[in-house]
Amino acid sequence: MRILHVLDHSIPLHSGYTFRTRSILREQQALGWETFHVTGSKQGASAALEEDVDGLHFYRTPKSGSMLSKLPVLNQMEVIDGLTKRLSEIIPLIKPDVLHAHSPSLNAVAALRAGKKFGIPVVYEVRAFWEDAAVDHGTAKEHGLRYKLTRALETYALKNANAVTTICEGLRRDIVERGIAADKVTVIPNAVDIDKFAVGGVADLALKRKLGLQDMRLIGFIGSFYAYEGLDVLLRAVPAMLARLPDLRVLLVGGGPQDAQLRQLAKDLGIADKVVFTGRVPHEQVQQYYDLLDVLVYPRLSMRLTDLVTPLKPLEAMAQGRVLAASDVGGHLELIEHGKTGILFKADDPQSLAQNVGDLLAAQEQWPALRANGRRFVESERNWPISVARYKAIYARLTGLAAAGTQDR
């Protein structure tokens, strides 16, 4: 089985998107499949048209230098056209059995064009609806023209793909509501590489002293500071928690668009000396910061994006046997069972966060069970071998090939 994956971007860029891709590719290769990989022009400038990264070979698509690439909306068509051309160059060389396009729909449309030209079935994998992400990032207005055009293109891709996969039940429901046959849509859930996460990490006391956090209870967040993560809700809950737990401190590890606003909010709330912002830390040091935290908090705001899409970070926390608290948005409800694998609080509500996280900090006798249940959940349901195995039936149905290794050719 030879699969050509059509991607928005990939490693060496770091994002949830690229890490999911890397995990899928490695697991598919472990099954004996040959995987090939091309990124669109949004990958950015590359020194060459082909690149090896972390043991994976990527074909790159050069950016267009035309005037159209600088115009809103029309520049998206340039992305599709450039990727379609690149696919037409690559496909005769590698002769794939399946084109597997991943979000956004620009990649799917290019793959559909190439699939029609060469007679190859297309799988479209929806990781999020990018029109909703654009609303949160401020580049589109909900139900505005750009939003509607992006949504229409998404629906076109869903209807014309031979099969559709997606990362969670929330997205699957929305896809089916667009008129896509339910039996055409398969959930390939986000997962973790269990072997990369150890349980029982011990806090680095030297790092704790360096941060001025010795002898403190620590809650916090590790990741990118996007508005939808709701870190402002966490900060607004801190004064109430401090009244109950004076030794509480908040550790925020990472950076992003909301960094400056969050630092200012901490000052405005009078808690700047109770919140530590580390900035971005090297990937190899992230584990040390996880080991410092008593409770990880994921206060995502309630909106279409967070109600439909499951995040990866809570799964990574469970894989480490961490204690976690999260808002009750739809994406979290798919992952976290209240009182069993974590605790949930009302989204967008600092008072609910303060009450529930405060109760959790005061009930340490519950932590061992929460840790064990979370780890068991990812071991049994959210690991990559189990998730990626779901592609077997999809590929076999589209190609008529047994979903095994390269001997099928």
Predicted regions mapped to residue ranges:
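Conserved acidic donor-binding segment of nucleotide-sugar-dependent glycosyltransferases
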Residues: E337-G339, I343-P350, D359-E365
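Carbohydrate-associated surface elements
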Residues: G170, A191
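Short hydrophobic beta-strand element within catalytic cores of glycosyltransferases
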Residues: Y298, E316-A319, V323-A326, I336
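A short, well-ordered alpha-helix in the C-terminal region of glycosyltransferases
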Residues: D247, S352, D359, Q366-E381, ...
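Acidic donor-binding loop of glycosyltransferase active sites
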Residues: I94-V98, N162, K274, Y290-D307, ...
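Nucleotide-activated donor-binding/catalytic signature segment of Leloir-type glycosyltransferases, i.e.
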Residues: A260-Q287
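N-terminal subdomain of nucleotide-sugar transferases
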Residues: M1-K63, M241, A403-D408
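Conserved donor-binding/catalytic core segment of Leloir-type glycosyltransferases
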Residues: R2-V6, L213-V238
